Amino acid sequence: MTFVENRIYLASRSPRRQELLKQIGVDFMVLPLREALPRIPDVDETPLPQESPPEYVERIARVKAETGRKRMSERGWADFPVLGADTAVVLNGRIFGKPENPLHAKQMLRALSGQIHEVLTAAAVAAGNGTRVCLSRSSVRFRNLGEQEIDHYLACDEAYDKAGAYAIQGRAAVFISGISGSYSGVVGLPLFETAQLLEESAIRIFQ
């Protein structure tokens, strides 16, 4: 299916994902999945029983994209592809989503301290020709963190809407001694894989 305009809907309120799309020149409009207060998920992000971390993020990204496309259709909006994404931090098979409160955030950072964890980000594009999903996997190494610096970091308030309670593009960059994989994927949207999905829906990055 070819779209008249080189434009997409982004089914996310994430400022990081918006900035990443701007970085590669994608013309997009934000499509909130429902009217919601900040920090309330647009979809139910509860993992299913026996669901692996990769299956989890791929499912949530798909649901976000397809829910956005359903809303687009119900409201009679212009027919553009809908991009959804989801990120999870995984340590020893355990999924770390967004922290529920400051204590939860502190527990996450304590667990990540001195460890190598995996960051999974799935992107999904729902269009007239179906839904395509991609998965980015990256490894991130944290140095050992002291209690005081964890407290100071949490006081800066950048942790609470991030998977794993940290922002690699923010002050938490000083915690990270190494990364293998996709930096943009760790931030929240793997640009290489996302560009490939968009190309498959006739959205050209360079035209």
Curated annotation (Swiss-Prot):
Leading EC class: hydrolase
Principal place of residence: cytoplasm
Family membership: Belongs to the Maf family. YhdE subfamily.
HAMAP family, per the entry: Maf (MF_00528)
Source species: Nitrosospira multiformis (strain ATCC 25196 / NCIMB 11849 / C 71)
Protein name as annotated: dTTP/UTP pyrophosphatase
Hydrolase is among the record's keywords: yes
GO cellular component, one term: cytoplasm
GO biological process, any: nucleotide metabolic process
Active site (catalytic residues): D86 (proton acceptor)
InterPro entries, alphabetized: ITPase-like_fam, Maf-like
